[in-house]
Amino acid sequence: MSRKKKKVLVKLVSSAGTGVFWVKQRNPKTQTEKLSFRKYDPKVRKHVQFTEAKIK
């Protein structure tokens, strides 16, 4: 039997509203708050804030 995975996949959605997203892993036991990164959005050609959303 395989071990149960400790990390979950989360979707980081662009705050610019372009529909661009990144997928990251996080450990819910150690990282209890929502993830938020400043990453590059190629549609806007700028670095914008990406915030966590659920993967459907």
From Swiss-Prot:
Keyword Ribonucleoprotein: yes
GO molecular function: structural constituent of ribosome
Pfam short name (any one): Ribosomal_L33
GO cellular component: cytoplasm; large ribosomal subunit
GO biological process: translation
Keywords annotated in UniProt: Ribonucleoprotein, Ribosomal protein
Source superkingdom: Bacteria
Family per similarity comment: Belongs to the bacterial ribosomal protein bL33 family.
Record-given protein name: Large ribosomal subunit protein bL33
Origin organism lineage: Bacteria, Pseudomonadati, Pseudomonadota, Alphaproteobacteria, Rickettsiales
Gene label: rpmG
